[in-house]
UniProtKB/Swiss-Prot annotation:
Family: Belongs to the ATPase alpha/beta chains family.
Catalytic reaction(s) noted: ATP + H2O + 4 H(+)(in) = ADP + phosphate + 5 H(+)(out)
Lineage: Eukaryota, Viridiplantae, Streptophyta, Embryophyta, Tracheophyta
Swiss-Prot/TrEMBL site (Required for activity) positions: 363
Entry's localization field: Plastid, Chloroplast thylakoid membrane
Functional summary from the UniProt entry: Produces ATP from ADP in the presence of a proton gradient across the membrane. The alpha chain is a regulatory subunit.
Subunit structure: F-type ATPases have 2 components, CF(1) - the catalytic core - and CF(0) - the membrane proton channel. CF(1) has five subunits: alpha(3), beta(3), gamma(1), delta(1), epsilon(1). CF(0) has four main subunits: a, b, b' and c.
Gene of this entry: atpA
Record-linked Pfam families: ATP-synt_ab (PF00006), ATP-synt_ab_C (PF00306), ATP-synt_ab_N (PF02874)
Name this protein carries in UniProt: ATP synthase subunit alpha, chloroplastic
Length: 507
């Protein structure tokens, strides 16, 4: 018969007592009172945070937006068709965040950073909050480097700098998205990461943009965040913040980023829908009172960081659609007041064949020539002045038939300058090409040509300088100054090409 050893038993009991770890897991839960239209009202969830993610019994995730005394208003990140009254909900203890990494480059994702391009999962080891605070005053420095768009009208007269917020505004079908995509194409080789956020767009329009970027090799440095028109309002509301979080990831790693929001007015409409369903009081145009804050907290995240933080930058180009050119509507005025200037696209100019249809008279950049290299400043000043005088004269000339020779010459020069601002889509120009184009126009070298010949001559001149006078581009790119040597090279090239062109035209 085995003997019972009391000391061994007591040791085992003592060990077990020492190893015992009393773990109490408290889960913050609630019950669904009502669900429908992408909104759920929950009883319970007493300690939930504003903006916290909550998980429903069947797996749908929601965001707690309304914290009321008797219930919590939750917006659903999905259709929520399987959620039933009385089903349980638990708080996750997490605020909305997304995974971030270099692997996102070249991919098309949704507002939850999940790939929607059918090319498999995206690996990531880090995450960022979808809504993080904008850099403070000390964390920023003033904008001083240009972000070239490749469009003469913008780079010469409405320059955009790295870290600036510049609004692109105009009626539908005036080429707003084309200006933004051309800017992305022009960043090739400039070490700029681009993020294109499509909010409430047609899926076919987004596919068109993605194809255009892929064909020209721009997807290598671009991320597309897309929520189509049929997406839940919650995801359309979140998409811009997801794009901003991805751009911030690169900005804080000392990189330069460009983010395009197309368009924030659709985000405001999604937010209005959510707010009205949550029974928040409506204000002007039925938008909630904090719709200004919706956009300001998004656009303030664009910045040029200080030297201490590595001088990374995030440049934002929000695109807003107007109705019949009315910029005094609620959302356009809000975004105009937040941004550092606006590029106004006119339907009249577009229909008159002036493309890009930029109305230079009412477009403005509040950063100005600080966002231009010295060479561009040297030639752009004269262009601005001559176009302003031309616009004034043109209006006056409509009421007068007998104009003196000087006025006729000035009108002829203005028409040719307006012609040189025209550009084909997806054909951005380098800074050197822009400088030679502007110099040719403002110094009267185009005056002898017919208006119909101007663009053809300029195209051939740019090719001629690129092949026969490569030193010109080297001087501009290395010194950033339009030196006397560069000027002499350009004058020779213009004369030589002019002679060649006139001979060809006679044949």
């Amino acid at each position: 018969m085995a003997t019972i050893r009391a000391d061994e038993i007591s040791n085992i009991i003592r060990e077990r007592i020492e190893q015992y770890n009393r773990e109490v897991k408290i889960v913050n839960t609630g019950t669904v009172l009502q669900v429908g239209d992408g909104i759920a009202r929950i009883y319970g969830l007493d300690e939930v945070m504003a903006g916290e993610l909550v998980e429903f019994e069947e797996g749908t995730i929601g965001i707690a937006l309304n914290l009321e005394s008797k219930n919590v208003g939750v917006v659903l990140m999905g259709d929520g068709l399987l959620i039933q009254e009385g089903s349980s909900v638990k708080a996750t203890g997490r605020i909305a965040q997304i995974p971030v990494s270099e692997a996102y480059l070249g991919r098309v994702i949704n507002a939850l950073a999940k790939p929607i391009d059918g090319r498999g999962e995206i690996s990531s080891s880090e995450s960022r909050l979808i809504e993080s605070p904008a850099p403070g005053i000390i964390s920023r420095r003033s904008v001083y480097e240009p972000l070239q768009t490749g469009l003469i009208a913008i780079d010469a007269m409405i320059p955009i700098g790295r870290g600036q917020r510049e609004l692109i505004i105009g009626d539908r079908q005036t080429g707003k998205t084309a200006v933004a995509t051309d800017t992305i194409l022009n960043q090739q080789g400039n070490n700029v990461i681009c993020v294109y956020v499509a909010i409430g767009q047609k899926a076919s329009s987004v596919a068109q943009v993605v194809n255009a970027l892929q064909e020209r090799g721009a997807m290598e440095y671009t991320i597309v965040v897309a929520e189509a028109a049929d997406s839940p309002a919650t995801l359309q509301y979140l998409a811009p913040y997801t794009g901003a979080a991805l751009a911030e990831y690169f900005m804080y790693r000392e990189r330069h980023t460009l983010i395009i929001y197309d368009d924030p007015s659709k985000q405001a409409q999604a937010y209005r829908q959510m707010s009205l369903l949550l029974r928040r009081p409506p204000g002007r145009e039925a938008y909630p009172g904090d719709v200004f804050y919706l956009h300001s907290r998004l656009l303030e995240r664009a910045a040029k960081l200080s030297s201490r933080l590595g001088e990374g930058s995030m440049t934002a180009l929000p695109i807003v659609e107007t109705q019949s050119g009315d910029v005094s509507a609620y959302i356009p005025t809000n975004v105009i007041s937040i941004t550092d200037g606006q590029i106004f696209l006119s339907a009249d100019l577009f229909n008159a064949g002036i493309r890009p249809a930029i109305n230079v008279g009412i477009s403005v950049s509040r950063v100005g020539s600080a966002a231009q290299i010295k060479a561009m400043k040297q030639v752009a000043g004269k262009l601005k002045l001559e176009l302003a005088q031309f616009a004034e004269l043109e209006a006056f000339a409509q009421f007068s038939s007998d104009l003196d020779k000087a006025t006729q010459n000035q009108l002829a020069r203005g028409q040719r300058l307006r012609e040189l601002l025209k550009q084909s889509q997806a054909k951005p120009l380098t800074v050197a090409e822009q400088i030679l184009t502007i110099y040719t126009g403002t110094n009267g070298y185009l005056d002898s040509f017919e208006i119909a010949q101007v663009r053809k001559f300029l195209d051939e001149l740019r090719d001629y300088v690129k092949t026969r006078k490569p030193q010109f581009e080297e001087i501009i790119s290395s010194t950033k100054i339009f030196t006397e040597e560069a000027q002499a090279l350009l004058k020779d090239a213009i004369q030589e090409q002019k002679e060649l062109f006139l001979v060809q035209e006679k044949v």
